[in-house]
Amino acid sequence: MADEGTLNIRYNSHATAEIIEGPQSGEADGSVMAYNYRLILTRDPANKIMVSKPANFDLALAKAASGGGFVPNLPNHKVAWNGGRLVGPQNDYPGGDWATRAAISKRYLDAMLMRLWWMQNDLDAPERLRKQFAGYGLAADEFPDNNHAPYEIYVREARRLVGRYVFKEQDNVIADGIARTPIHSDSIAITDWPVDSVACLPRNAPGSNTDGILFLGEETRPAQVPYRSILTTEVENLLVPVALSASHVG
């Protein structure tokens, strides 16, 4: 279970997908999910810009920026690459100033471009990745004034409101006695995606995936999001629908 307003790290087993309790389960540690960019790629010869080897290429960084995959079948022969999830730098983003956040964002973009070049050009890269990414370049007609990269990094999780209600793990699972998720009289939305977290820290427990990864596809059910979770406890006439009041697992 996740304490309200705190991060509850669990480990996800490769073989059985069972939860493996961590040594400090239930204690907050300040970690959030890894970030990345959603680069738009294409194999269209008339609309692709192949990535050259970055001047600051770092093989270790290229290999570390792993995870994720393609969102296929976008219009105009494009895919969205939801990968390059470098684990660790994101934890300094929520409390960082604008200069810190800009530096972290640049590190993620650099790492993704390094990884793309490595997967396409290094024979030591896994054959599966070389085949998957062969021929893909940045879409020339996407973000042409920003070197064809999105303007913003994909911030999965950062600073959040602690509001009049904290939406948490228990709101996403079957409640005792009613065979459904908890009912909120002030519900304003219904969740659709299962409880899901990408990696949070670059470490692995024995027999486990990277720290923080979980996907509770079987346990999660559609849940009601109460109006109170977007209301502050102190400020009137303010709604916070994006950075709403929720725990990490919520």
Positions of predicted regions on the chain:
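Flavin (FAD/FMN)-binding glycine-rich loop and adjacent Rossmann-like elements that form
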Residues: 1-249
